[in-house]
Regions:
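N-terminal amphipathic/basic-hydrophobic helices that include classical n-h-c signal peptides
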Residues: 1-17
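Long, contiguous binding/interaction regions
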Residues: 12, 16-178
Length: 178
């Protein structure tokens, strides 16, 4: 007996990937006159992409539990809590932090990530290929679209490295290079 929407979708559609997952294929390499410093930069980026907090190491996210609410956080009807209030940790893994005065979950991370990373989630389904110390190949998914801000930040932080970034979002049928 089928008991959930997920099971119904699996029965109807099989094991297909739902749209709005953007596939990213990134190749990072030196200039051809690779030095130990270039190789060290490639190794550092490899480590960053292998970690769970990939984008947060490239463009650091604020420490939300220690960020008091600002007046601007409560504009446009998004009343999270009282000005200056800190979110409190709760044991629910889905909500994690709540403003006690309103009971509303702290969602400030969402707008910040969209504005600063161009996507709501960090990289996921990451596969790193590092057969060559002078080159790094990484494939991963992001929500909705490629994280253009992350691509630009890597190029800015590592000017001696070349970055080739291809993305493909099959749900909306767009692809290209950054």
């Amino acid at each position: 007996m089928i008991t959930s929407l997920t099971e119904i979708q699996a029965q109807l559609y099989g094991d297909i990937q739902m749209p709005n997952h953007c596939h990213n294929r990134v190749t990072i390499y030196g200039s051809g006159n690779d030095t130990d410093e270039t190789r060290a930069q490639i190794a550092k980026l490899k480590q960053i992409f292998e970690d769970e907090n990939t984008f947060g190491q490239i463009i650091p996210e604020p420490d939300w539990p220690n960020m008091p609410l600002l007046t601007s956080d409560n504009l446009y009807g998004n009343k999270y809590g009282n000005d200056g209030e800190l979110p409190q940790k709760v044991e629910d893994p889905w909500t994690r932090y709540v403003f006690i005065s309103t009971g509303i979950t702290d969602q400030r991370w969402y707008d910040w990530r969209v504005q600063n990373w161009d996507t709501k989630w960090d990289a996921y389904d990451v596969v790193v290929t590092d057969d060559d110390p002078d080159q790094l190949e990484v494939e991963f998914n992001t929500a909705w679209s490629p994280p253009e801000a992350i691509c630009h930040a890597i190029r800015e932080q590592y000017p001696d490295l070349a970055v080739s970034w291809f993305y493909d979002e099959p749900g909306c049928e767009y692809a290209g290079y950054l």
